[in-house]
Protein backbone atom coordinates (compact mmCIF):
# COMPACT_ATOMS: atom_id res chain seq x y z
CA UNK A 1 0.00 0.00 0.00
CA UNK A 2 2.77 2.50 0.82
CA UNK A 3 4.66 1.63 -2.35
CA UNK A 4 1.55 2.24 -4.44
CA UNK A 5 1.11 5.74 -3.03
CA UNK A 6 4.83 6.41 -3.42
CA UNK A 7 4.55 5.47 -7.10
CA UNK A 8 1.44 7.61 -7.48
CA UNK A 9 3.26 10.52 -5.84
CA UNK A 10 5.96 10.35 -8.52
CA UNK A 11 3.31 10.61 -11.25
CA UNK A 12 1.32 13.49 -9.77
CA UNK A 13 2.15 17.17 -9.62
CA UNK A 14 1.55 19.02 -6.35
CA UNK A 15 -2.21 19.34 -5.98
CA UNK A 16 -2.83 16.36 -8.27
CA UNK A 17 -5.49 13.84 -7.26
CA UNK A 18 -5.72 10.09 -7.14
CA UNK A 19 -8.78 7.91 -6.59
CA UNK A 20 -8.34 4.56 -4.86
CA UNK A 21 -11.45 2.42 -4.46
CA UNK A 22 -11.14 -0.61 -2.18
CA UNK A 23 -13.05 -2.90 0.15
CA UNK A 24 -12.76 -1.84 3.79
CA UNK A 25 -12.75 -3.97 6.92
CA UNK A 26 -14.27 -1.21 9.04
CA UNK A 27 -17.63 -2.38 7.77
CA UNK A 28 -20.76 -4.15 8.86
CA UNK A 29 -20.22 -6.85 6.24
CA UNK A 30 -16.74 -7.82 7.51
CA UNK A 31 -17.95 -7.85 11.12
CA UNK A 32 -21.05 -9.86 10.24
CA UNK A 33 -19.72 -12.32 7.65
CA UNK A 34 -16.03 -12.72 8.53
CA UNK A 35 -14.45 -15.38 6.31
CA UNK A 36 -17.64 -15.51 4.21
CA UNK A 37 -17.45 -11.81 3.32
CA UNK A 38 -17.54 -11.71 -0.47
CA UNK A 39 -15.07 -8.80 -0.68
CA UNK A 40 -12.39 -10.74 1.22
CA UNK A 41 -11.74 -12.20 -2.21
CA UNK A 42 -8.49 -14.05 -1.49
CA UNK A 43 -5.96 -14.17 -3.06
CA UNK A 44 -6.74 -10.98 -5.01
CA UNK A 45 -6.57 -8.81 -1.90
CA UNK A 46 -3.34 -9.34 0.02
CA UNK A 47 -4.15 -6.56 2.46
CA UNK A 48 -7.44 -4.94 3.41
CA UNK A 49 -7.62 -1.48 4.92
CA UNK A 50 -9.90 0.23 7.37
CA UNK A 51 -10.94 3.87 7.10
CA UNK A 52 -8.44 4.63 9.87
CA UNK A 53 -5.52 2.82 8.21
CA UNK A 54 -6.04 4.65 4.90
CA UNK A 55 -6.12 8.00 6.70
CA UNK A 56 -2.81 7.11 8.40
CA UNK A 57 -1.31 5.94 5.11
CA UNK A 58 -2.28 9.21 3.42
CA UNK A 59 -0.57 11.24 6.14
CA UNK A 60 2.57 9.10 6.12
CA UNK A 61 2.95 9.39 2.35
CA UNK A 62 2.26 13.15 2.36
CA UNK A 63 -1.16 13.09 0.76
CA UNK A 64 -4.25 14.93 1.92
CA UNK A 65 -7.31 12.70 2.06
CA UNK A 66 -9.82 15.00 0.35
CA UNK A 67 -12.88 12.79 0.62
CA UNK A 68 -14.13 9.30 1.39
CA UNK A 69 -17.27 8.11 -0.39
CA UNK A 70 -18.85 4.89 0.83
CA UNK A 71 -20.42 3.32 -2.25
CA UNK A 72 -21.39 -0.21 -1.31
CA UNK A 73 -24.38 -1.93 -2.79
CA UNK A 74 -26.41 -5.08 -2.23
CA UNK A 75 -23.58 -7.29 -3.50
CA UNK A 76 -22.00 -7.27 -0.04
CA UNK A 77 -25.07 -9.14 1.23
CA UNK A 78 -26.10 -11.49 -1.53
CA UNK A 79 -22.51 -12.47 -2.34
CA UNK A 80 -21.67 -13.11 1.31
CA UNK A 81 -24.92 -14.97 1.96
CA UNK A 82 -24.20 -17.18 -1.04
CA UNK A 83 -20.70 -17.93 0.25
CA UNK A 84 -22.18 -18.88 3.63
CA UNK A 85 -24.33 -21.42 1.80
CA UNK A 86 -21.53 -22.72 -0.40
CA UNK A 87 -22.79 -21.03 -3.58
CA UNK A 88 -19.99 -19.52 -5.69
CA UNK A 89 -20.41 -16.34 -7.70
CA UNK A 90 -20.25 -18.38 -10.92
CA UNK A 91 -22.81 -21.00 -9.86
CA UNK A 92 -26.08 -21.31 -11.76
CA UNK A 93 -27.73 -20.56 -8.39
CA UNK A 94 -25.84 -17.28 -8.04
CA UNK A 95 -27.81 -14.07 -8.17
CA UNK A 96 -25.04 -12.67 -10.37
CA UNK A 97 -25.55 -15.43 -12.96
CA UNK A 98 -29.31 -15.85 -12.82
CA UNK A 99 -31.25 -13.37 -10.67
CA UNK A 100 -34.52 -15.22 -11.32
CA UNK A 101 -32.93 -18.55 -10.38
CA UNK A 102 -31.16 -17.33 -7.26
CA UNK A 103 -32.04 -18.07 -3.66
CA UNK A 104 -33.09 -14.44 -3.04
CA UNK A 105 -36.52 -12.96 -3.57
CA UNK A 106 -37.06 -9.44 -4.90
CA UNK A 107 -38.15 -8.45 -1.39
CA UNK A 108 -34.83 -9.67 0.03
CA UNK A 109 -32.88 -7.85 -2.67
CA UNK A 110 -34.77 -4.64 -1.93
CA UNK A 111 -33.90 -5.01 1.76
CA UNK A 112 -30.24 -5.58 0.84
CA UNK A 113 -30.26 -2.37 -1.26
CA UNK A 114 -31.87 -0.38 1.55
CA UNK A 115 -29.41 -1.74 4.12
CA UNK A 116 -26.46 -0.88 1.83
CA UNK A 117 -27.74 2.67 1.42
CA UNK A 118 -28.04 3.12 5.18
CA UNK A 119 -24.60 1.63 5.82
CA UNK A 120 -23.07 4.00 3.25
CA UNK A 121 -24.69 6.96 5.01
CA UNK A 122 -23.16 5.73 8.29
CA UNK A 123 -19.73 5.09 6.66
CA UNK A 124 -20.15 1.38 7.41
CA UNK A 125 -20.42 0.03 3.87
CA UNK A 126 -17.93 -2.59 2.72
CA UNK A 127 -16.19 -0.49 0.07
CA UNK A 128 -15.26 3.13 -0.39
CA UNK A 129 -13.64 5.54 -2.80
CA UNK A 130 -10.72 7.49 -1.32
CA UNK A 131 -9.72 10.76 -2.97
CA UNK A 132 -6.07 11.58 -2.28
CA UNK A 133 -4.49 14.94 -3.10
CA UNK A 134 -0.73 15.30 -3.30
CA UNK A 135 0.59 17.89 -0.83
Where are these regions (language model features)?
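Short, conserved clusters of charged catalytic residues that mark active-site
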Residues: 3, 49, 114
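Acidic/polar loop patches that form or flank catalytic/metal-binding clefts of enzymes
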Residues: 20, 65-70
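Short, glycine-/aromatic-enriched active-site segment of Class I SAM-dependent methyltransferases
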Residues: 18-47, 52-59, 83
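A structural motif corresponding to the C-terminal end of an alpha-helix
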Residues: 11-13, 57, 61-63, 134
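A C-terminal cap/extension of S-adenosyl-L-methionine-dependent methyltransferases
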Residues: 70-135
